[in-house]
């Protein structure tokens, strides 16, 4: 997985309820290539150096494996232009991507919207657009008591996504780890630690 292959599948999306959602769509797995039989070379993955990351606006902190790449996407909507900020970190020689995205709602919409409805719609849209099956879900709260939802799902290509979504101060955050079945087993504790490290910083 490369950042170029991931970014086109992350976008601001609307559904019939009018909610603005961040959807993470995973690319389809490439067709299998037949290779001559040979004993594979086993190489140990390079352990990344994790460090605390804070975005330019200072509204959250999270542990990331190195400096994430940043991408900004702009979407015109009936509420005006919505900016989607995307941060992606991918350790070398590991089939995993650590992603944080957020988008701000217009003030009036943020005041009126039901956080749980936004979270439920985000879950449904993620499953639909990635053609995935839900593995587990639970309602959660951020460390400063903002509503959230954790979901885990798998698509037909075997990619597993574990995501925590939060609605706070007119903003929808999504914190995700996308990996393969094989890597998920070895990275389960690392992914949990990554998700647990996410902290929302309230506006002053």
Pin down the residues of each PLM region.
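Bacterial N-terminal signal peptides that target proteins for export
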Residues: 1-10
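Signature of long, low-cysteine stretches enriched in small and polar/charged residues
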Residues: 63-89, 122-168
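A short acidic-to-branched-hydrophobic micro-motif
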Residues: 86-117, 173
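N-terminal "mature-domain start" segment
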Residues: 40-83, 142-145, 192-199, 204
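Boundary at the C-terminal end of the N-terminal hydrophobic targeting segment
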Residues: 22-24
């Amino acid at each position: 997985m490369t950042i170029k292959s991931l970014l086109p599948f992350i976008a601001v999306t609307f559904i019939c309820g009018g909610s603005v959602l961040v959807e993470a769509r995973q690319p389809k797995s490439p067709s299998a290539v037949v290779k001559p039989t040979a004993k594979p070379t086993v190489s140990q993955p390079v352990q990344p150096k994790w460090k605390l990351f804070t975005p330019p606006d200072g509204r959250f902190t999270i542990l990331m494996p190195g400096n994430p790449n940043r991408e900004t996407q702009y979407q015109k909507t009936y509420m005006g232009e919505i900016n989607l900020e995307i941060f992606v970190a991918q350790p070398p020689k590991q089939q995993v991507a650590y992603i944080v995205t957020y988008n701000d709602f217009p003030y009036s919409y943020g005041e009126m919207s039901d956080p749980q409805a936004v979270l439920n719609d985000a879950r449904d849209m993620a499953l639909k657009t990635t053609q995935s099956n839900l593995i587990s879900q639970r309602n959660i709260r951020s460390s400063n008591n903002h509503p959230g939802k954790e979901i885990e799902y798998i698509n037909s290509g075997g990619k597993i996504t574990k995501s925590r979504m939060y609605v706070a101060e007119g903003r929808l955050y999504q914190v995700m780890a996308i990996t393969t079945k094989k890597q998920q087993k070895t990275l389960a504790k690392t992914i949990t630690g990554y998700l647990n490290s996410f902290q929302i910083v309230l506006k002053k």
